[in-house]
Amino acid sequence: MTHTTALRTALIAGVSFMTMAGAANAQTSAESEARIAALEAQLAALSGQIAELKAATAASPKDTRPAPGATTVTLSNGRPTIATSDGAFSASFRGFFQADAAIYDQRDAGPLSTDFRRGSFGDAAENERARDMSDGVNIRRARIGMEGKVFSVFDYNMVYDFGGSGVEEAGRVSSAWLQYSGYPVKVRVGFFPAPTSLEDASSFTGSLFVERASVAETVRGLAGGDGRASIGLTASGERWNLAATVTGNTVTTLTYDEQLGFVGRAAYVPFKGKDWMIHVGANANLIIDPAASGPDVALAGGAVTNVRLRDRPELRVDGARLIDTGNIDADGVTALGLELGGQIKNVYAQGEYFNIDVERRNSTLSDPKFDGWYVQAGWTLTGEPRRYNTATAGFDNPRPAKPFNPKKAQWGAVELAARYSTFDLNHLAGGPGNPTLPGAIRGGEQNIVSLGVNWYLNSVVMVSGAYRNVEVRRLSPGGTAFGAATPAAGAQVGQDLDIWSLRTQYVF
């Protein structure tokens, strides 16, 4: 009985244990299934969110900016440029090449004793060439350099030139300057041409003719011009431009006491429409203290401070100058100019008048006064207008709408050009055959009619052809002004001639 009871008790206990274990196992499986279901729901939700993010990313614009600190290299219009991605630093390589060819159509040359045509005073070589100006070719400009930006607010420019007038030169600094551009009024320091006139405001690669009008070029050389030591201020807006520059010597000039000059210019666009505009302006070019030609010895009346006005007949294949005042011992020079220009669609015109007043030094003679003016116009047959540059207040060349490509029947832009200029460097000159009066200056009067065609194949290549009719009326001062073979006082030493020229230009 005892054994039976014990067995029964053991069986009941075993069944109870198995029942309890099964219940526990059933409870654990249910919890696991619930957790798995929850995880699957979370994965499904995450998958949906990822799909939405992919769709949104595909629809948004791509950020193509270079990584911070990266540099970019471009070749816009053939000009290699390296710049940082933020534009704070840049370097652009510049190149300018202008080759001129010319034919001078003159009366046949005779001996100096009977052929009185002359060039500059006291220059035997020019007086020989004035009777037979040299047909040929000349590299007018061959410049290479760099320009760019430093720390966002500084601009710089360095250009070296190997061209010349009549003959090529060994090389010289054309410009080397640094400019702070962080304020509306920009400050520039270095060696650069101050803006002297409307004619000077056009870039030398975009002017209507290959050389500036004679009077504008001469005024430019007083206190401006390439490679002149300068410090200047400029400011401009959509319709106005102001510039003021204090200048010194040019880099190729060696004197005792250097020249001190001032150049100021103001320009304004009073009227402007959709495809037309009017420009007015005024300029002043002053030599405050001319450069000294020797030691400043007080007992001898001080150093001679000469100024000289002369120019070529608006072309430089031959370097001879047909009008020339000679040296004038001066205390200073004041040249004042007025500007007027305008544009209607693809037709443009501009003109300037200049008055030049020279103040003699230590002299009772009258102060000489000279003047000159020009007017010129251009018409682009292919329809592109000249571009008015508000930063310089000047007109630059048209940009071809269809660059030259014969395969596509594209021929670039073609522009017709015309100009009349006159420049009078006479003071108390008197008439032919008359003796030279005290204080008189027989520098001559030059009148030039120019007609031309400019062909802009693209934004970097241009070919320009022109014809000039040159008339120079000039009387000999007598004495030894032209050397041993100086014609008698009052003899005509001017001349008439025709000049044909062709320029090829490449600029990047």
Where are these regions (language model features)?
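Gram-negative bacterial Sec-dependent N-terminal signal peptides
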Residues: M1-N25
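Alpha-helical, heptad-rich or low-complexity scaffold/stalk segments
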Residues: A26-P61
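Outer membrane beta-barrel
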Residues: N77-P290, K369-A409, A413-G431
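Short, solvent-exposed secondary-structure boundary motifs
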Residues: D63, T72, D135, L222-A223, ...
